[in-house]
């Protein structure tokens, strides 16, 4: 969209590693987005907000387009269905102290993630992007879920269509800009 922005990368999880972060964001989660007096913490909501407020943009699917419902479903599936189980894998394999790690919980949620990932495999069998015949913020959101999976080594379970879709996303200049930061800083 060509918007100017400032990004601050913090060691994860910032509520424990960044003094004063909960004074700014009481729930202590990332992302935390501000636009004037607007403060938001939900990734999909932030994307939807930006596309709606600063559009029109082809990154959004309009209410009058046939794939509008599909677009919203993918946009919100990214966090609620695809990213959520990965947060438990992250917690119980990396973030918790060694004595509190639960490999069986992590393994169960990794299986859950891979089962939910079938929807991406099916959706990308006959199309380049998830909806509306073009790249949208739904692809950005699902792309993050795939990126997190790759970071957690869950990408070993990706099927052929998902692999090809993820490769298309990674080839985009915006993806490359967004992932310039050392992933070790972010996780």
Report the location of each language-model feature.
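GST-like domain detector, emphasizing the conserved glutathione-binding G-site
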Residues: 1-104
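A generic structural-conservation signal
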Residues: 7, 133, 158, 178-179
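Conserved beta-strand edge residues that scaffold enzyme active sites
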Residues: 11-14, 138, 183-184
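Phosphate-coordinating loops and pocket residues in cytosolic domains that bind phosphorylated ligands
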Residues: 23, 171, 180
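Active-site-flanking alpha-helical
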Residues: 51, 145-146, 179
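GST-like fold's C-terminal all-alpha helical module
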Residues: 75-173
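Terminal-tail/helix-coil boundary detector
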Residues: 175-187
């Amino acid at each position: 969209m060509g918007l100017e922005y400032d990004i601050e990368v913090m060691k994860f999880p910032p509520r424990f590693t960044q003094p004063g972060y909960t004074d700014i964001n009481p729930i202590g989660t990332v992302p935390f987005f501000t636009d004037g007096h607007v403060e938001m913490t939900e990734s999909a909501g932030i994307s939807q907000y930006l596309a709606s407020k600063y559009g029109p943009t082809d990154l959004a699917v309009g209410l009058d387009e046939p794939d509008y419902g599909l677009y919203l479903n993918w946009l919100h599936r990214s966090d609620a269905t695809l990213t959520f189980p990965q947060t438990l894998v992250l917690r119980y394999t990396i973030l918790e102290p060694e004595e509190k790690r639960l490999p069986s919980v992590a393994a169960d949620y990794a299986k859950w993630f891979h089962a939910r990932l079938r929807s991406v495999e099916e959706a990308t069998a006959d199309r380049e992007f998830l909806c509306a015949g073009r790249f949208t913020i739904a692809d950005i959101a699902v792309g993050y879920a795939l990126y997190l999976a790759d970071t957690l080594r869950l990408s070993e379970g990706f099927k052929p269509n998902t692999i090809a879709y993820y490769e298309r996303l990674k080839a985009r200049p915006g993806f490359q800009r967004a992932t310039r930061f050392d992933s070790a800083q972010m996780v």
